[in-house]
Amino acid sequence: RGLGDVYKRQVQKYIGGDSASPRINKLSGGEWKAIKARAKAAIAVFAKDLIDLYAHRKMEKGHAFEKDTVWQKEFEDSFPYQETEDQLRSAEEIKRDMEKPFPMDRLLCGDVGFGKTEVAARALFKCVAEGKQAAVLVPTTILANQHYFTLKERFENFPFNIEMLSRFRTSAQQKNILSGLESGEIDLVVGTHKLLSSGIKFKNLGLLVVDEEQRFGVEPVSYTHLT
């Protein structure tokens, strides 16, 4: 059920270069109509599941974070650049949402180089400073590496344990990271789709930041919002 079925049978745009030639159907034929009907039915099922999921989320209670602390101010004041008005407004709105007693679901949009990472960093700091864990989900290992080192540098003056979970880590390192997430030893983790694996267990996850959310698809990201 759900998005997987849609992908298996949905009508797709043909892209050349595939090893197998596409099967041709007559537009007026019964087989083409059946294919479209299956795709529509699968989409309807997935849409219902998604609506049920969002309704369930609305009934969930979330953790209400405390107001900004002196430590939060120190972290934000350590930013070496002048913030833009949009950065300041977005960061404040996100932090105010985190202080409400229900799960936050926010979309932050901005062009490359406009400071989205710093806005996310301030939310991540607010989370881990209160003893919760935070995760940053990214679509590629290159982005994971980039965000990991950026956040390591940004948090270097504060006593938080930051790790990265991707193919850049050996099997032994990944095992230790998984153990650290479950025990609470790791405060902040940056990872690829591995973070969506069923074997991942957090001791006290308080915030999930998804970079380039559109590259993960609706279904996996929507279900992670329940964590």
Give the role of each language-model region:
Residues 2-10, 224-227:
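Conserved small/polar residues in nucleotide/adenosyl-binding loops
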Residues 8-11, 17-23, 37-38, 62:
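N-terminal cationic and glycine-rich segments that engage phosphates or anionic surfaces
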Residues 25-114, 118-129, 133-135:
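Pre-Walker A segment
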Residues 133-150:
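Conserved Walker A/P-loop ATP-binding site and its immediately adjacent core
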Residues 145-170:
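Conserved helix-turn-beta segment of the N-terminal RecA-like "Helicase ATP-binding" lobe
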Residues 164-174, 192-195:
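Conserved helicase motor
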Residues 171-188:
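Conserved motor-coupling elements within RecA-like helicase/translocase cores
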Residues 201-226:
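SF2 helicase catalytic motif II
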